[in-house]
Amino acid sequence: MLAKFKKKYIGDWDFYQKYLLLAIPMILQNAITNLVSFLDNIMVGQLGTEQMSGVAIVNQLIFVYNLAIFGAVSAASIFGAQYFGKGNHKGHMYSFRFKLYATLLVTGGAILLFLTKGSALISLYLTDTVGNGATDVALKYGQEYLAIMMVGLIPFAVNQSYATNIKETGQTFIPMLASFVAVGTNALLDYLMIFGIGPFPKMGVQGAALATVIARYIEALIVIIWAHMHRAKNRYLEGAYTGFGIPFAELKAILVKGFPLMMNEVMWAAGMTTVTQCYSVRGLDVVAGLNIASTITNLFNIVYLQLGSCISIVVGQYLGAGKLKEAKDADDKMIVFSVFCCVIMAALMFVVGGFFPGIYNTSEEIKGLATQFIAVSAIIMPFCAFSHASYFTLRSGGKTVVTFLFDSVFTWVIVVPAAYLLAHFTGLGIVSIYFLVQGTEMIKVIIGYYMVKSNVWVVQMV
């Protein structure tokens, strides 16, 4: 029995070496990014609860925008990688054009929305349960932060268009280097501008926003300048700006195959922010506690998120080569490994996570809420690892409609209604509500298990 289990679910050293060589650079890059985000969050947290909450709410809104951008570039990347693999540089150029158009269209829509409805969107997350006027102060800081952050949306969009195309050519170092430079710049400028160190004025939340915007421009410039200085490695740039068209066949293919993926990213992100809005009706303390908890959780969930993402790459390679049996075997082993690693990280987070809220300059009530939210997240995290791995297994076989149903439709049909009903129509405490809503992941685990087991994803597309 044990030997059978080991053969099916545990690989040899060569297997894990290949898997980890792919995953570790991605884990490190995301670890550095999230660590800087954590430091940024702490620095803003030193300013006070209202400042921290205002910034956290705006970041929730920008999170939806970011995922919309990722969805737009992912839709074209499905074809971009294959165009490059075939040596079809013109096709690769058309996918690049699509990314530019799609990301700039999304950005234009986001800026228009934030300009006209920004205050109203922020106010959705502000419920004054104690009558001390703190929500008005948080709204003011949120408006200040959003006004500056909008300036950084365009370079972010253009950078994603370039960086994803560069990665499709196998040149992953430059986007990673640009990201490291950006997060380092962001961290340094955060410290100088938030607190007014040296010649810099004390700008508070405006300083945090300005530091992020400057870092976005630096990252975009590094990537764009490198791409145009190395045209031989970036053949998709040939003719990219000498015309504006995309052949109808290519455009239709990208939209048909990529639209569910694009909508999935947007709807899932919107669903998650809606869940947060449901929690926020329980007061500003809840918003602040969730902000602290999510920042800490993001430090610990990097491992399972990146291990899960690698599944689509490794399994996709086997499927593309027609090695369907090997694809199923690798998938079983990688899912088990991802969950195993997540159990270790979750246990670590459960033990040490409670120490982090003490760093913040906020009330003991908020620190207590954050500690309990972190503990709940640690308990649920291994289940999230399994459903995440299941999602990328289905995606590796090109089942974009299935992943759309599995991810965003599940969020809107199960998670959002659960959060809304529990927050608005029960007398349960917020921690109990949070646990029950997070617990809906169990349903997703069961669905994911049967979907993966059905082998509906075992498809050779090329």
Task: Describe each model-derived feature in a short phrase.
Residues M52-L112, F156-P175, V287-G353, C384-F406:
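Small-residue-rich hydrophobic transmembrane alpha-helices
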Residues L21-D40, I148, N159, A182, ...:
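Transmembrane helical elements of multi-pass membrane transporters/channels
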Residues L28, D40-V44, V55, G80-G85, ...:
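Hydrophobic/aromatic residues within transmembrane alpha-helices of membrane transport systems
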Residues T49-Q60, G142, L146, A209, ...:
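Small-residue hotspots at the loop-to-helix junctions and early N-terminal turns
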Residues V73, S77, I148-E168, P175-N186, ...:
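Short runs within selected transmembrane alpha-helices of multi-pass transporters and secretion channels
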